[in-house]
Each structure stands twice: as C-alpha cells, then as structure tokens.
Amino acid sequence: MTIASLRHYDFIVTGASGNVGRHLVPLLARGGRTVLAVGRDLDTLRKLFTDQPHVEVASYDALAGLTACDTLVHLAVRNNDTRGSLADFIEVNVDFAMRIANEFKRMNGRRFLNIASILSLDEDDQSPYAVSKAMGVQAIRELVGKRLDNVHIGYFHDGGYFGEKLRMLAAFGPAVGSAFFAMFKMLKPTTSAQSLADYALGPAHALPHPEILTDDLSDALLYRALTRMLDIGVALAIMLLLAPVFAAIWVAIRLDSPGPAIFAQERVGAAQAPFTLYKFRTMKHGTASAGTHEVSASAVTRLGAFLRRTKLDELPQAINLLRGTMTLVGPRPCLYSQTELVEAREALGVYTLKPGITGYAQIRAIDMSQPLVLARADYRYKMLRSLLLDLRIILATARGRGGGDRVAAPDRP
C-alpha cells in the first residue's frame, strides 16, 4: 500500500475511511483490481489498508494529478446521524460532491457510482440530509449526465461486522451475533458489503428506478413465519369476531340488488399463479370482468359504494389469508387482462411477493389506473419491506389512508 502512484485506477473510492468504505475497498481490490482510497486523513487510510497490496491512498487534492478513471464510488457524505444546518449539509453533500464530479468529468470517467441511504427516498423527509442529498444528485447529474449511477442502500453490514449501531453483537461470537442480526433484519432493510461490491463490479444502471440495493427477505424464515402467523391470526379474528357483521352485510347485499353476496374472481398471484379472490359484491351482477378503474361508476350498487369506501367489501379476503394465497401487506392483485401492469410488475420482480389486502401503494392512493406508477411503488415496497414497514402500512390502512381503485366516470346517455 502506497500513496497514489498510478495515473489510472479501476476504482476511486471517496470517503474510504468511513464505515462503508473500509469494508468495500478490500472487496473491490480482490483479483488484482487497482483501488485508490481517498479521504481527509491519510494516516487513518494507511492503517486501514496497510495489508492491501492493490490499494493505494490519497487526499482529495491528489485527484487533480490523475488523468483517467474507470469507476468512481462516491461515499463522502455528511450523514443523517450528524447535526448541522442545511448550509452545513449542502457544503458536503452538494458543493463537495460537485467538486468530485468535476474531477471525474475531467478524467473522462466511465461510471460515477453515487451511494446514498434509503432514508433519502422519503418524499416527506425535509431534513437537511434528505434535502441536500436530493440537491447533490441533481447537481452531479447536470455535470456527468448518464454516467451517474445512483444506489440507495439500507443498514450496512459485512459478515461479522453488524454495523456501528450493533457492533456490540460481535462480542457474542459469530453464531449468536448472526442470530440476533437475523432478527434485526426483519425490522429494517439491510445491505451487505458483498452485494454492494458485486453491484459496483457489475454493469452500470442494473437496478430499476429508484435504484434500491437491499438484502432479499424472501429467504428470511423468521420474517416469513411471523408474517404468516399474523395473517392467520388476523383472518381468524375477522371470521370469529366479525361473524355478525359478515351475516348482516350478506343479507344487505342480497336485499340491495340481485345476485350472490360473495364475488369470486381469478387474479394474478405470487409467481403469476392464478388464485381465486373473494370479496363482498359491490357491483351489479353480470358486470364485465375488468379492472375496477375501467368499470363505470354506474355499475356500483348503492350499498357497494359504502362497502368500498369503508373497505368492508374486503372482509371475505380472510379466506385468502387462511389459504395462504394472500398476505396482509403486499401488492394488490390484478387481473390477467391488465397486461400493462402484469408486464411491468414482472419486469421489476414484484411477483416474488404474495398479493396483499393492503399495500405500500394503496396507502399512497396509487391505484391500478396508473399501472407503471403502481408497479414502481410495488417494487419500492419489495426492496424496503420489513416487519416495521408492514405494521406502519397496516396502521395507516386502519386509519383510513388510501382506498380502493377508482372507478370510471358514469356512462353518459
């Protein structure tokens, strides 16, 4: 390990002495790839990477002496766990980021990999960190254009390193520490150092917008077990405690309009497998099978409008919960005839999830009349899902946020 001696590196990593950089740099250097670790404190960088023969270190001023760059990984940031005014955050997350981007542009770099926290994705977050990161991304994009590759990561970890906030887990040994961390992963999206390194070593722009890189919960047995228990518990509670409500709605529907009280329809399930969805009927018997937003409002019965508004029409989906064809939180199931939505969800990997009674998109009032927007919201949930997010979505639904799909305007005579 030496001070910068080459004029071209496979990777330049800014903020290399931070929690992410110190674990990412050695992974990037495997296989003989040359890495320049850049930071403000050269002594710290030397100590961190002294045993890495393909890693060299430099201060930020040394970037001016480089003539070429392949990939620049930008980690230097004023993070959300530090205090300061908006001006303080802009100084690092915008002005300093622009300085780095200008050096990258001068070197005619191929890829500017900008790493940010998933916290910066929250549209409602007006904290100095979130605001400054959004400004920084826009400023970098104006300088480097399509060479900018944004990636949003979750809580960072690496093997026996469980992140700064959970570093005490290492004292319990790898087995116990990993077991506790597995429980933590249910509560918060996480990102491993290896997955970030793999992305940096792979092709640019390989992630769908909004470029989220988190650990997959599909194989998290504890998360799956707890969500399944929650599904069954809620389903049984609905069917046992609300039996009189079921009966009253059934009778009211039969009296309100001709036709069965229960509406059964084939929908697209996990892995695009068909399943039968059950709801209380809210439309006139014989209404064409189509997306709700494609059906005229005149097809909705008087009682149906009330049931849809209060979400009582979805109570029979307790049957789907018990059968395991649906879960409490997930993408709302669509029809096979809604090809634009089906194809968009397939492209984003959404069908690895079970459909849900409520979901991330639903509480944001995104329905099936916006298929591409809906698919992207479903993808965002897939990448951000956790037990805490599921509970927040359930509580938001209980408080009345979101609703069913909009229906089309009434037919004109």
Predicted regions and their residues:
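Flexible, glycine-rich beta-alpha linker
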Residues: 121-128, 149-179
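NAD(P)H-binding glycine-rich loop region in Rossmannoid oxidoreductase-like domains
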Residues: 54-95, 103, 119-124
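Active-site Tyr-X1-5-Lys
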Residues: 126-152
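A hydrophobic, helix-centered structural microdomain
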Residues: 219-285, 393-413
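Conserved Rossmann-fold NAD(P)-dependent oxidoreductase catalytic core, especially the SDR/UDP-sugar
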Residues: 98-131, 149
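A short, structured surface patch at a secondary-structure boundary
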Residues: 294-353, 394-397
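N-terminal Rossmann NAD(P)H-binding glycine-rich loop of SDR-like oxidoreductase domains
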Residues: 9-31
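C-terminal terminal-structure detector
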Residues: 350-413
